[in-house]
Amino acid sequence: MSKSENLYSAARELIPGGVNSPVRAFTGVGGTPLFIEKADGAYLYDVDGKAYIDYVGSWGPMVLGHNHPAIRNAVIEAAERGLSFGAPTEMEVKMAELVTNLVPTMDMVRMVNSGTEATMSAIRLARGFTGRDKIIKFEGCYHGHADCLLVKAGSGALTLGQPNSPGVPADFAKHTLTCTYNDLTSVRAAFEQYPQEIACIIVEPVAGNMNCVPPLPEFLPGLRALCDEFGALLIIDEVMTGFRVALAGAQDYYGVVPDLTCLGKIIGGGMPVGAFGGRRDVMDALAPTGPVYQAGTLSGNPIAMAAGFACLNEVAQPGIHETLDELTTRLAEGLLEAAEEANIPLVVNHVGGMFGIFFTDAESVTCYQDVMACDVERFKRFFHLMLEEGVYLAPSAFEAGFMSVAHSMDDINNTIDAARRVFAKL
């Protein structure tokens, strides 16, 4: 047995499923998850000594690559001053100033510890600000594991939501309406059925949890218009896309102005950080200035703030996003060329430093139904053969891939060459 197999066997006796987040268990592709010993640049190194070109990037945060010296040094320096104070620090002010400068739609920002905390708190704030209970989310989008978000559509387009996890009371789920991503007609229908009850729409501007599905040109502006028409708030969940699709996020890339924005992943530079912010009048409703309660023992932790501050300063340097786009475009084009040579039907979506690989005969993938029609079994074989080639992709057909500026063009070309060999075996 490999060391990863031994560790996984031991972990399953002590940790549910052997992992601390379900997708890591390889349940989406089968087999034994790799246990990682270290990471540097564009590479992961497992406990058995094998190196992999990494396109997971810790599920998004590692836009600069692993173990970036500026972030590592900032963490070490901050740790020497203390680990946590439970009191305000100068770095929190500097971090808030930096974030609000980089994302102009955020007049104010509140730091939390995860993307789930950010979305959960933003929805509570939207409900408190509007005095309404219902929310709209989209089929195939994921916004963390808060009860009100673990909801699937009912049997009809306008039925009340149903829990998709045991432990979520139906009374919670009934306030969540699930519409079809990239379909404004379904959203208008929900508003027309509940015109005075919907507090907010929450949306991934690029859906990254049904692989990678960009918005159609009219979709995000249409959501903005519907929110304005019916008096609801628009929450854009930029936990994945923030500082990755563009410096000011996908909202800037696509030209839409939200009322609230949720951030995570890159904002922490690899440390557990989330944030939410937006319009000053909305944020003023948050405690202690307003009645909507939110708190956190480790929110604004000095080490996490130092890591995030260092990361965002690096991400803000000229050329970062152009490099991400160039590398991702080359990877997408190369994979499509290699698949065509092997007569493998393939669609590769990509935006900025995100991409998605779909085994499908369809010309495009634009919604949840398109994603579910893809050949998941072929993806599983593709994943394991690429892993044997030393390429680490997301272990699920429903998760986006992430590029970093630490990837070289040689890494990209080697990945394409590996895919060419793998396609010949599929």
From Swiss-Prot:
Cell compartment(s), UniProt: Cytoplasm
Enzyme superclass (EC): isomerase
Reactions catalysed, as given in the entry: (S)-4-amino-5-oxopentanoate = 5-aminolevulinate
Cellular component, GO, one term: cytoplasm
EC number: 5.4.3.8
Pfam families the record matches: Aminotran_3
Top-level taxon of the source organism: Bacteria
Similarity section: Belongs to the class-III pyridoxal-phosphate-dependent aminotransferase family. HemL subfamily.
Known partners and oligomeric status: Homodimer.
The name this protein goes by in its record: Glutamate-1-semialdehyde 2,1-aminomutase
